[in-house]
Amino acid sequence: MTSPIHVNSEIGKLKTVLLKRPGKEVENITPDIMYRLLFDDIPYLPTIQKEHDQFAQTLRDNGVEVLYLENLAAEAIDAGDVKEAFLDKMLNESHIKSPQVQAALKDYLISMATLDMVEKIMAGVRTNEIDIKSKALIDVSADGDYPFYMDPMPNLYFTRDPAASMGDGLTINKMTFEARQRESMFMEVIMQHHPRFANQGAQVWRDRDHIDRMEGGDELILSDKVLAIGISQRTSAQSIEELAKVLFANHSGFEKILAIKIPHNHAMMHLDTVFTMIDYDKFTIHPGIQGAGGMVDTYILEPGNNDEIKITHQTDLEKVLRDALEVPELTLIPCGGGDAVVAPREQWNDGSNTLAIAPGVVVTYDRNYVSNENLRQYGIKVIEVPSSELSRGRGGPRCMSMPLVREDLKK
C-alpha cells in the first residue's frame, strides 16, 4: 500500500501540500488579545487572502497539488459521521466553564453545514452571536466585556506546526500554547476518517495526547535517514527523545536525529525560523543562533544498546551536517548576508524561512530582498511571493505549508 504521506527530504520536488487560507479568524484578532493569540499585529484580511492565494497559485504553477485544511476536515467529519463527536471534543478543549454556554454553542454549531461549522470553529464564536436566556452564576460573574465564547484560531494558516510529515507518516502535535492547542484536532480527524488518509498506510509516529510539546516548525527532514529537530521555545528535549525511541523501534527508516538547540524566544520560536535546507549541500541560517566561531549546540541521537538512545554532543553544526548527509562540502548561507542590522530585520520577517519546492528552488517572501539576492548569488532559484500582510503572523512560506508528498531524491 502506497502511503498518502511521503516526505523523505526538505528539498525533493514538492507534489502535494496542505494549506489553510486565512479567514474570518484573522479579523477576530483585537489589540487586547493579539499577544495571547501569538500575534504582534493585526493583518488586513482582503490583502492577506490575496497574498495567500498568490502563494497557492505559485505552488500550482510549479506542479504542486494544493489541498486545504478546512475542506479536508469537513470531508473527514462527514465521511466518518463524527460531526457531533468532533464538536463535543472541540468544545471540551475550548475551556468553556459554563454548561449553559457549552450547550448553546453545541446547538448553534451543529445546526450548520459541516464546512460552515468547521470554518466557524476556526473563526471563533462571538458572544453576540448566541442569545443565552438562562444564565448560571458562573456566566454572570464572567468578564462581560470579553467578546468571544470560543476564541479564534488565527495561527491556522501556519499549517506546518500542528502536524508534520515524516517519511511515510507524521506527527500530530501537542502544541505549546493554549492559543494553538486545538489546531491539531483538525489533522487528527483527517487521519482518522478522511478516505484519502485513514487506513491508507500512513503511520502516526506521535499523537496530540502527549504531555510534552512538539511543533512542526522544529521538525526538518534532512534525508530519508536523518532528521533535524529544534530544541526551542515550542519543542522540548523530552519530546525529541520520545520520538527518537518510536522512530528507531518501528522501522521508520530514520537512523539519526540532530537535536539543534536554539534561543527560546518569540522571534526564533521554531528551528525553521532560523535554519532551512534549500539544496543538497546548502542551508539558510540566521547568525543569531551561532556562538563564537559559528558554534551551535547540537545533540546527535542514534540507536544504542538495549533500546536505549545514544546521545553525542557536538558544536560544529557544519561538520555535523556534512557527516550526517555524507557530502564533502556544505554551505551555510547567512540571513541578510550576515549584516548586523539586515540579518535580524529580515529574520523577523522570515528571511530564513524558505520553502524548497525542488533542489535549489525556493519560495520566499519578497520583502526580504537582501536575503533573496544573497541566495541567488549562491545559485539558488528564488521565487518571491508578496508578503506585506502574511508576514504579520511571524511565519514564512515554510511555516504556511505542510508537505504531504515529495519526490524522493536521486541517490
Curated annotation (Swiss-Prot):
Reactions this protein catalyses: L-arginine + H2O = L-citrulline + NH4(+)
A Pfam cross-reference name: ADI
Keywords from the named record: Arginine metabolism, Cytoplasm, Hydrolase
One of the GO BP terms on file: arginine catabolic process to ornithine
GO CC annotations on file: cytoplasm
InterPro entries: Arg_deiminase
Pathway(s) of this molecule: Amino-acid degradation; L-arginine degradation via ADI pathway; carbamoyl phosphate from L-arginine: step 1/2
Broad class of the protein's primary localization: cytoplasm
EC numbers on record: 3.5.3.6
Compartments reported by the entry: Cytoplasm
GO molecular function, one term: arginine deiminase activity
Active site, renumbered: C399 (amidino-cysteine intermediate)
Superkingdom in the source lineage: Bacteria
Family note: Belongs to the arginine deiminase family.
Protein name: Arginine deiminase
Natural source organism: Latilactobacillus sakei subsp. sakei (strain 23K) (Lactobacillus sakei subsp. sakei)
